[in-house]
Amino acid sequence: MNEIVGDLWHEHAAGAVVAITTNGMVTKSGKSIMPRGCARQAADRYPELTRLLGSLLINHGNHVFDLGRKLVSFPVEEDPYRNPEMRLIEQSCRELVELTDYKGWQKVVV
Protein backbone atom coordinates (compact mmCIF):
# COMPACT_ATOMS: atom_id res chain seq x y z
CA MET A 1 0.00 0.00 0.00
CA ASN A 2 1.22 3.47 -0.88
CA GLU A 3 -0.28 6.69 0.38
CA ILE A 4 -0.62 9.33 -2.31
CA VAL A 5 -2.22 12.75 -2.42
CA GLY A 6 -4.08 13.72 -5.54
CA ASP A 7 -7.27 13.64 -7.55
CA LEU A 8 -9.11 10.29 -7.61
CA TRP A 9 -10.42 10.98 -11.08
CA HIS A 10 -6.95 11.73 -12.43
CA GLU A 11 -5.88 8.30 -11.13
CA HIS A 12 -9.00 6.76 -12.67
CA ALA A 13 -8.24 8.33 -16.05
CA ALA A 14 -4.70 6.95 -15.78
CA GLY A 15 -6.06 3.40 -15.43
CA ALA A 16 -6.45 2.84 -11.69
CA VAL A 17 -9.53 1.20 -10.23
CA VAL A 18 -11.26 3.65 -7.86
CA ALA A 19 -12.96 2.47 -4.67
CA ILE A 20 -15.87 4.75 -3.83
CA THR A 21 -16.79 5.07 -0.16
CA THR A 22 -20.46 4.15 0.11
CA ASN A 23 -23.26 3.36 2.54
CA GLY A 24 -26.01 0.75 2.63
CA MET A 25 -29.09 2.94 2.20
CA VAL A 26 -31.45 2.56 -0.76
CA THR A 27 -34.36 4.82 -1.74
CA LYS A 28 -37.92 3.55 -2.25
CA SER A 29 -37.22 3.65 -5.99
CA GLY A 30 -34.27 1.28 -5.54
CA LYS A 31 -31.41 3.74 -5.96
CA SER A 32 -28.45 3.89 -3.61
CA ILE A 33 -27.97 7.12 -1.68
CA MET A 34 -24.69 8.77 -2.71
CA PRO A 35 -24.98 12.20 -1.08
CA ARG A 36 -21.44 13.55 -0.78
CA GLY A 37 -17.72 13.09 -1.30
CA CYS A 38 -16.36 10.73 -3.94
CA ALA A 39 -19.68 8.83 -3.99
CA ARG A 40 -21.46 12.01 -5.10
CA GLN A 41 -18.74 12.71 -7.66
CA ALA A 42 -19.09 9.18 -9.06
CA ALA A 43 -22.90 9.45 -9.20
CA ASP A 44 -22.62 12.78 -11.01
CA ARG A 45 -20.18 11.31 -13.55
CA TYR A 46 -22.04 8.02 -13.99
CA PRO A 47 -25.76 8.50 -13.16
CA GLU A 48 -26.53 4.79 -13.70
CA LEU A 49 -24.40 3.89 -10.66
CA THR A 50 -27.15 4.75 -8.15
CA ARG A 51 -29.54 2.21 -9.69
CA LEU A 52 -26.83 -0.45 -10.17
CA LEU A 53 -25.51 -0.16 -6.62
CA GLY A 54 -29.05 0.05 -5.23
CA SER A 55 -29.92 -3.26 -6.90
CA LEU A 56 -26.74 -4.90 -5.58
CA LEU A 57 -27.44 -3.63 -2.05
CA ILE A 58 -31.02 -4.93 -2.14
CA ASN A 59 -30.01 -8.35 -3.47
CA HIS A 60 -26.67 -8.95 -1.72
CA GLY A 61 -26.30 -6.54 1.20
CA ASN A 62 -23.69 -3.90 1.96
CA HIS A 63 -20.48 -5.30 0.43
CA VAL A 64 -17.68 -4.38 -1.96
CA PHE A 65 -18.95 -4.68 -5.55
CA ASP A 66 -17.30 -4.33 -8.94
CA LEU A 67 -19.45 -1.63 -10.54
CA GLY A 68 -17.74 -1.73 -13.91
CA ARG A 69 -15.96 1.29 -15.44
CA LYS A 70 -12.99 0.59 -13.11
CA LEU A 71 -15.15 1.50 -10.09
CA VAL A 72 -15.88 -0.49 -6.94
CA SER A 73 -18.08 0.27 -3.97
CA PHE A 74 -16.31 0.43 -0.60
CA PRO A 75 -18.88 0.45 2.23
CA VAL A 76 -17.90 2.47 5.29
CA GLU A 77 -21.32 2.99 6.91
CA GLU A 78 -24.81 1.53 6.89
CA ASP A 79 -26.49 4.95 6.95
CA PRO A 80 -25.09 8.14 5.35
CA TYR A 81 -26.29 10.19 8.31
CA ARG A 82 -24.26 8.28 10.91
CA ASN A 83 -20.54 7.93 11.54
CA PRO A 84 -18.49 5.37 9.60
CA GLU A 85 -18.18 1.99 11.33
CA MET A 86 -14.78 0.36 11.91
CA ARG A 87 -16.31 -3.14 11.64
CA LEU A 88 -17.67 -2.36 8.19
CA ILE A 89 -14.46 -0.66 7.04
CA GLU A 90 -12.46 -3.75 8.10
CA GLN A 91 -14.92 -6.01 6.22
CA SER A 92 -14.63 -3.80 3.14
CA CYS A 93 -10.82 -3.92 3.29
CA ARG A 94 -10.87 -7.72 3.33
CA GLU A 95 -13.40 -7.89 0.50
CA LEU A 96 -11.47 -5.35 -1.60
CA VAL A 97 -8.24 -7.34 -1.24
CA GLU A 98 -10.06 -10.53 -2.31
CA LEU A 99 -11.65 -8.81 -5.31
CA THR A 100 -8.38 -7.15 -6.32
CA ASP A 101 -6.55 -10.47 -6.21
CA TYR A 102 -9.34 -12.23 -8.13
CA LYS A 103 -9.46 -9.55 -10.85
CA GLY A 104 -5.68 -9.11 -10.98
CA TRP A 105 -5.90 -5.34 -10.66
CA GLN A 106 -2.52 -3.64 -10.43
CA LYS A 107 -3.63 -0.37 -8.83
CA VAL A 108 -6.67 0.43 -6.68
CA VAL A 109 -7.16 3.90 -5.23
CA VAL A 110 -9.34 4.48 -2.16
Language-model regions: role of each:
Residues M1-V109:
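Macrodomain-like recognition of ADP-ribose-binding/processing modules
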